[in-house]
Amino acid sequence: MLTETEGRAAVKLARKTIEIFLSKGKSPRPDASGVELSPVFEEYRGVFVTLTEGGLLRGCIGHPYPDSTLKEAILDSAISAATRDPRFPTVEQDEMKNILVEVTILTQPEKINASPKELPDKVEIGKHGLIVKQGYCQGLLLPQVAPENDMDSIDFLSHTCMKAGLSPDAWVKGAEVYCFEGQIFKEKEPDGEVIEEKF
């Protein structure tokens, strides 16, 4: 778990990384952001960076698995959310004054070993994020997606399947389901106070 101070640093690092990248056109080094980073940023963690503008999603990309240090994962995810999310055009530099930055630190995903009938009861809304895998298809939804969209566990499972490009009932038909938890830090206003969001 990150402290509030570390959570603020994670969000500031994501914002500064995007701002530097958009102004200079290249990825900054983590220490170029001017954000003081504690030793936790050297640990290997999964992370997602989410950008919203006017209450609407503007970009969301991350590392589901702990495949790099937290600081490197934040740098990569921040730049990708702003410039490589295929659902949206690249963020413009002057847009950043209207964009809220959110960073979700993930636990290691764990497979849910349960029958399809038992599966919905294993999913805790507001606590769990989900990954659904089948063949070459994989989809992920963060823990905050379900409560923010008034989903129950069946809705959440179905939407994660659709995110993977599968039918909504793939979780009933043998797709593998993994859960993880997320610690969410977000700006209350653009480049403003950072809070930890809990559901």
From Swiss-Prot:
InterPro entries assigned to the protein according to its UniProt record, in alphabetical order: AMMECR1, AMMECR1_dom_sf, AMMECR1_domain, AMMECR1_N, AmmeMemoSam_A, Uncharacterised_MJ0810
Alphabetical list of PROSITE patterns matching this protein: AMMECR1 (PS51112)
Domain AMMECR1: 5-196
Disulphide linkage map: none
Pfam (any one): AMMECR1
Protein name, as recorded: Protein MM_0484
